[in-house]
Amino acid sequence: MELRSVEELMDLLYACRGERPPAGPGGGPGDPHGHALRTAALLRRRRPADKELQVAGLVSPVGRLLWPGDPAARTADVVRPLLGARVARLVRRQAHPGAWVHDDDLASLRQADDEARTADFDAGVLEDWRTVLELTAARNSRLGAVD
């Protein structure tokens, strides 16, 4: 699957509402949609200029809706053409603790992800992120045209 537009990505993110993680240890947050919104909101507060980092926190639950395998790798593969290599790298490597030890971006993403599991605050709604997704996709599109 390849996302061709922010609208398609928004549809996938909306489909994550009400989705439940697999049972068992490390199954993930109880509400992946809300968790992703909280993660992105925490990153927005801490790193307001880093839209790609915020978006990486937002799109993480998408992989659970796609074919079997590693959800982080699926998400990275699906968002890369639309959102760029950096977002895909952050999403893919976030699931591997050894990868984020020496990477400040991954450490920030992981910290926000962990905090969002227990944080209880109004993180807004998904529609609040449409403009950030569009800006990130447009920036990636321009960069891709230059390559």
Predicted regions and their residues:
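Metal-dependent phosphohydrolase cores
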Residues: 1-147
